[in-house]
Amino acid sequence: MLMMKRICFIFFLIFSASLYAERDTRWVEIGEGTYEQGFLFPYKIKLSVPYGVKNIDEIKQGLFPVKIELDWLLIQYSKEDVGKLFYRQFKDKFKDKEESFRLSQHIINMFLNKLPSVQKHDHWTFIYYPDEGMRLFIDDKKIYHLVGAELNRALLQSWLSNNPVLTSKLFSRILKIK
């Protein structure tokens, strides 16, 4: 009986700590830039990390929480086009892992089906926690929770390592310190 109480107490501490961390994360914006895919500039992107995080390599590897805000620049973009855009983002980061991409296809399609059409200045927020995955919020309403370490890393990499100019702009505040 005592052992059961201890296990319940430990579970409660772990669960409450993750909820507390999510609500009370003090985000610091470290950079912003415009995402491009070919000749298309679909959105501006802002990168924020918790206060005190300064290691660029560890941020890129997904070892720290990250908040990514997208401000859409396109006047109007259909649900299908938004899905194609994110599909290419995933596919580009699975280049060397074609089989892994095929295995993840079902989860990727579920995510893509949740994405709505967009209009200029629509605001999306992706919040990533290493242990919990990535959540998508549109107008402060949770739309989807993307699970799977490889999928989350692929999406993070599509933003953080896609283009050297965008990468340097996203990490500009940290680069100025070093």
Question: What annotation goes with each model-predicted range?
Answer:
Residues 1-3:
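Short, Lys/Arg-enriched N-terminal segments with co-localized hydrophobic residues
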Residues 21-178:
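Terminal leader/tail segments of proteins
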Residues 5-10:
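Sec-dependent signal peptide recognition
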Residues 16-17:
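N-terminal signal peptide c-region/cleavage motif recognized by signal peptidases
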